Amino acid sequence: MRLNKSLHDFKKNHLRKKNQVIFRSLHCKNYYKVENLYKFLLAEKNSFIFESVEKGTTRGRYTIIGLDPDKIWDIRNNVVSLDNNGKIDKIKTNPLKYLNKLINEFKIEIPRKLPSMASMLVGYFSYDIIRYIEKIPNRCKDDLKIPDVRLSRPRNLVIYDNLKKKIHYIENIYADT
């Protein structure tokens, strides 16, 4: 199997503590084979699917599956919980400054042959995140018990390009793991 970089280049970048993307791309004209692969992958814990739907179309250019996050960040009540491969750390900090630092440190060079979403932080920001910015009374009962913010960093992505009929198998290698 041919990958996008040599072992020598990989080791050199790894020693420099540089985030890297390893990938393999294949032509796949039969979308039903891709759908079956997705059904299998989506059974994994903490996996997700995105469709890049535009202008009311049924299917957009890219179908993206992410799985196997190495880190998951939950923010709730000014506490960041970091799940680092099963090890949970609680960090009492300013959540907005922490998020800003996290996003600024998330630098990874995406090869031109790949879509820009080949490496990502994925998750949600709840409506209650506004309370970290403005002083708004919190009179509502918290009956959902979900974090104000949840972000994960998937190690593995499978991206199908519906236009070029190409599937990309991607492994993100992060220097801090």
Predicted ranges, named:
Residues M1-T177:
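Signature of the chorismate-utilizing enzyme
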